[in-house]
UniProtKB/Swiss-Prot annotation:
Catalytic activity line of the entry: GMP + ATP = GDP + ADP
EC numbers for this chain: 2.7.4.8
One cellular component term from this protein's GO annotations in UniProt: cytosol
Main function: Essential for recycling GMP and indirectly, cGMP.
Domain Guanylate kinase-like: 8-188
InterPro entries noted in UniProt: GK/Ca_channel_bsu (IPR008145), Guanylate_kin-like_dom (IPR008144), Guanylate_kinase (IPR017665), Guanylate_kinase_CS (IPR020590), P-loop_NTPase (IPR027417)
Keywords annotated in UniProt: ATP-binding, Cytoplasm, Kinase, Nucleotide-binding, Transferase
Family the entry assigns: Belongs to the guanylate kinase family.
One GO MF term: guanylate kinase activity
Protein name stated in the entry: Guanylate kinase
Residues at which ATP binds: 15-22
Keyword Nucleotide-binding appears in the UniProt entry: yes
C-alpha cells in the first residue's frame, strides 16, 4: 500500500501596523497548536514582551544583508520607507509544508506579493481595521513610535488598505475573538479542500 503525504497549506496574513495581527495570531496559535507559525527575521528593535526566536528573529542590517545574499529568504522587503527590513526564512516554511503541516506567515504587502509569485497556491488574507479612525487610535495608543514613524506607518497603511482586493479573504478585526475564529475557519476549510 502506498502512503500519500498531504502537502501542508500556506496562509499569508497581512495588515497595517496596529491592526492587531500579533494578537489575532496569538489567538489562532492557541486554537490550532499544530499550526506552524513562520518566524520572520527583522531589523527592528524588539517591543516589550517580544522574544527573539519566538516572535521574530531580531537581526542587524548586516546579518539581514547576508541572509539576502545567501538566498535564505522566501521574501523580504524594506518597510516604512526603509526604516526597517523584514523577511521570511525559506527553509522552515518549505520543510513544514513538505511534512504536511499548515503554515501561517505574517508579512507586509510586498512580502505577500513576493510569496504569491513563488508559491501561487498560498492563500492571502488581509486583516483590516474596522475604520481608519480606529487604526489611527490603536497606532498612537501603543506609545512605541515617534510622530514621524507614526506618519510613515499611516502612509504605508493607506497603500495596504488600497490593495485589499489582491487578497483571497479580508477579515475585519473589530473584535479579536471574531477575527481569530474567522482565520481559524479558513485553516479548517483549507484543510478540507
Amino acid at each position: 500500500m502506498v502512503e500519500h503525504t498531504r502537502k501542508g497549506r500556506l496562509v499569508v496574513l497581512v495588515g497595517p501596523s496596529a491592526v492587531g495581527k500579533s494578537t489575532v495570531v496569538r489567538c489562532v496559535r492557541e486554537r490550532l497548536p499544530e499550526l506552524v507559525f513562520s518566524v520572520s527575521a527583522t531589523t527592528r528593535a524588539p517591543r516589550p514582551g517580544e522574544v527573539d526566536g519566538r516572535d521574530y528573529r531580531f537581526v542587524t542590517r548586516a546579518e539581514f544583508d547576508a541572509m539576502i545574499e545567501a538566498g535564505e529568504l522566501l521574501e523580504w522587503a524594506e518597510i516604512h520607507g526603509g526604516l526597517q527590513r523584514s523577511g521570511t526564512p525559506a527553509a522552515p516554511v518549505r520543510e513544514a509544508l513538505a511534512a504536511g503541516k499548515n503554515v501561517l506567515l505574517e508579512v507586509d504587502l510586498e512580502g505577500a506579493r513576493s510569496v504569491r509569485k513563488v508559491m501561487p497556491e498560498a492563500r492571502l488574507v488581509f486583516l483590516a481595521p474596522p475604520s481608519w479612525d480606529e487604526l489611527v487610535a490603536r497606532l498612537t495608543a501603543r506609545g512605541t513610535e515617534t510622530p514621524e514613524v507614526i506618519a510613515r506607518r499611516l502612509e504605508t497603511a493607506r497603500i495596504e488598505l488600497a490593495a485589499c482586493d489582491e487578497f483571497d479573504n479580508v477579515i475585519v478585526n473589530d473584535e479579536v475573538t471574531s477575527a481569530c475564529e474567522q482565520l481559524v475557519s479558513l485553516f479548517v476549510s483549507t484543510n478540507s479542500r
